[in-house]
């Protein structure tokens, strides 16, 4: 699939001071002269800051890493996780359309997106707050059909559940991610058939619990949310 940059581009891009510090910390993971190896996390951080990857953002990251613009552009256009056009200011919804989800109703979820957001993928809703696209397998096949919204998975969806999620996002809420039908993690719908007497007591699986604890879900990253740690420097610095 041919991927092109959006014809709508901002005049410039630069990291916030905190995100610039974060990006430079990523560069220290690699030997001197190999800083270009940090291109994926640095591009990802730029996308988290702005919501999508503009040409100025790609070129800024290339300059930061000392690499030709075309090399950074090759990476940005190769990986579908990079959004090359503006996305909804509240949420970008990615509907899994691969086999299991398709069999379980992904086409119906896509119809909801067309009706409530925009008729075409990657187009913004009338108020600019939402966008959507169909993507390949997101790896939650047991809990099909599902969607990724921001950083989180919303699983075991129905037409009604997805429509309600969109309405809640529009109202300023951030619904709890994970299964939307009461299932714990990826257990069988009828409940566990082995180790049935093992009572964990957790309300959510580890990834959902972490998302709730950090409060880092669909919001943009300004650099203050995630601590900058460089444990790989401890040994070489003698700390």
From Swiss-Prot:
Provide the catalytic activity annotation.
a quinone + NADH + 5 H(+)(in) = a quinol + NAD(+) + 4 H(+)(out)
Q: State the Pfam families in the record.
A: 2Fe-2S_thioredx (PF01257)
Subcellular location(s): the record lists: Cell inner membrane
- The Enzyme Commission number assigned here is 7.1.1.-
From which domain of life does this come? Bacteria
InterPro entries assigned? NuoE-like, NuoE_dom, NuoE_N, Thioredoxin-like_sf
Names of required cofactors: [2Fe-2S] cluster
- What is a GO molecular function of this protein? NADH dehydrogenase activity
Binding residue positions for [2Fe-2S] cluster: 96, 101, 137, 141
Result for mutant: residue 101 to A/S = Alters UV-visible and EPR spectra
The record's cofactor note says: Binds 1 [2Fe-2S] cluster.
Family designation: Belongs to the complex I 24 kDa subunit family.
Tell me the protein's name.
NADH-quinone oxidoreductase chain 2
The record lists the organism as Paracoccus denitrificans
| Lineage start | Bacteria, Pseudomonadati, Pseudomonadota, Alphaproteobacteria, Rhodobacterales
């Amino acid at each position: 699939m041919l991927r092109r940059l959006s014809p709508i581009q901002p005049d410039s891009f630069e990291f916030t001071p905190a995100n610039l510090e974060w990006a430079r910390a990523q560069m220290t993971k690699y030997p001197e002269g190999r800083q270009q190896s940090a291109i994926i996390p640095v591009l990802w951080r730029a996308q988290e800051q702005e919501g999508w990857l503009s040409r100025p953002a790609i070129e800024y990251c290339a300059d930061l890493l000392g690499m030709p613009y075309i090399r950074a552009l090759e990476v940005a256009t190769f990986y579908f996780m990079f959004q090359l056009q503006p996305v909804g200011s509240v949420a970008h919804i990615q509907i899994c359309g691969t086999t299991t989800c398709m069999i379980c109703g992904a086409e119906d979820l896509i119809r909801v997106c067309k009706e409530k957001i925009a008729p075409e993928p990657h187009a913004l809703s009338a108020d600019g707050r939402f966008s959507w696209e169909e993507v390949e397998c997101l790896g939650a096949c047991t809990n099909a059909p599902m969607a990724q919204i921001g950083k989180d998975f919303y699983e075991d969806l129905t037409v009604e559940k997805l429509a309600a999620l969109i309405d809640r996002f529009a109202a300023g809420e951030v619904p709890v991610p994970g299964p939307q039908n009461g299932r714990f993690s990826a257990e069988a719908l009828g409940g566990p058939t082995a180790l049935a007497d093992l009572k964990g007591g957790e309300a959510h699986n580890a990834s959902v619990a972490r998302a709730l604890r950090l409060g880092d879900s669909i919001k943009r990253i300004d650099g203050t949310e995630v601590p900058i740690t460089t444990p790989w420097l401890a040994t070489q610095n003698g700390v």
